Amino acid sequence: MREYLFSESQKKGAVMRVLIFDTETSGLPVWSSPSDDPMQPHIAQFTAVIFDDASGEEEEYVDLIVRQEWPVAPEAFGVHGITPERSIEEGVPEDHAVMFFEAMSAAADRIAGFSLSFDMRIIRIARLRAGRAKGLLDAEAAVQKAKQFDVMQKCTALCKIPPTEKMMATGRKTWKQPTLVEAVRALFGEEMADAHDARGDVLATKRIYMHLKGLGLA
């Protein structure tokens, strides 16, 4: 794995850098439990890209399969399809994903994702598991919040997906927040061939981000 370092000149350049990242996991987070609960899921795949906000030119890219040394929920495997064999053959320790996220987020001016709160929670779980201090993460989260941009929330009004019956039953008549597949279909009239692969999700999210940028919404 290539060592990932940013020089001070890169960090201080005039270019606005955007980090988009995505995780596939061993299961869903237990939202009602603390992030350091041992029952919280692990990262199965971590993909991230840093690019120039103006041109979209990619500066850094990483795609990691994480070695699964813990049970994987059947429903999670059904989503991302990362087999135990592939995990063992290609996988790296989970803290590698943590280190890449920390380096890339420090170098970025904006952190973006599709349903960003999910992936930020997964990263927090992994960072605590890797021994990062909770107090430090809490302080950092307060700073990072200003840098965060949720592509899903920003494109909801553009996608114009009607509310579901469940939403209507509870009096919610706003547009439904799209899945990434639905957003690509609504905005570009295309079907995603590689949905729920972190690499495919990152590239699709970047495409939507640049579309929003062109409309003055990002």
Regions found by a protein language model. Name each.
Residues 1-23, 27-33:
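N-terminal accessory regions of nucleic-acid-interacting proteins
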Residues 31, 88, 195-196:
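Short loop/turn and capping residues at structural boundaries
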Residues 4, 9, 17, 39-84, ...:
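Metal-dependent phosphoesterase core characteristic of DEDDh/y 3'-5' exonuclease domains
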